[in-house]
């Protein structure tokens, strides 16, 4: 049998911290696949998406400002291990092409706007060092590929091998900034606690950790002075124990040339383990590439504070109700009020057939879990997940962020629900990680293991199947209390390709 473990396989499992039971569970997932989720509806206004009035927004902002003064620990959590290589896919293709001058729209746009790039002067110096000519001279001499090689190659700026967080994104008179630096500044504007500390945690890949540490060491003093606060920056790496086994198309072990098993990173869902080790009351989560220059930050900061204010208000009500339930003899009216809070405020529709003697236990179980409030933007056709009301195993219906692969696209009704969804997930979360007694939740307990993904890849010219764990904001938070809030599109400005840096939202105010 091609899934029998050899002695060296068991040694590898032990090194990685993966049990044989976990391995067997992964193999079962390949054999059985993952079920599609049963949809109730796409989330919409009055159906799971909050649209707070201006007056309500002010009340939530005040709630957050008050919370900041009360000594709670707040952390910003930024997944930053992704390599930037996908940003440069079109430029790598240009270097390999059998033509030497820009042909595609993307290539032409890149060279047309190159002078606007935040890394332009660095690239110019690099070209002078490598070729003894500046960018202008190289372009006049039709040496377009040499300019790209100076940007991407290890002998040049090495942008093709660095993580996104370390590339220059935005221009300022006193020095251009990377996304890491933008996150420091942004965090100082909504997550500075009463102790004047700004806590930010970056998840990074092992090979880049030193580069991140160096950037922080070089820049901390400057930004602490600007922000009038102490920067407390920490890092972690995805754990080897969250890697997943690769298999052949027949679900046998995929073995490498030396006969060893192949394990692959389990995707961003693995970061639930990193998040679980964060000691904080409130955690802001945002992707590394979704940052804007200072003149656009006020709107981002406003909505971050709004999400946080909604979260702490909901959390305080939840804690109040849990304490009432602790008192045992809750009145019928109180039980009714708690049920209404769960259904109306936490957007969780309870099953109709709960036995009366079980109701208090069900209400307690629904209340006593991690909580998140997520911003949602208008859907303009971006690839990625969206907000839905979904049936749970216990018959309840709650809010989830789903990817297209979790939805049965062969079912016309479900496909239409996905395609006609009004909102898109920009990865803009504020999370509460402790219970009403101040004890941290054990986050892996709230993952739905049936929400992973199977993807098809290749290695050394051979096809393989890979397993992605339930996504961090998808199935990994499936059993959290979840609330969605409409936020404007201006708060969502990711950089997916190098040309995105030429968009107005990433250019200096006076160059727009």
What do the PLM-derived regions correspond to, one by one?
Residues 1-35:
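Small-residue-rich anion-binding loops in enzyme active sites
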Residues 346-372, 381-385, 396-402, 406-512:
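Primarily single-stranded nucleic-acid-binding OB-fold modules
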Residues 2, 10-18, 39-380, 388-401, ...:
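Domain-scale recognition of functional cores that engage charged ligands
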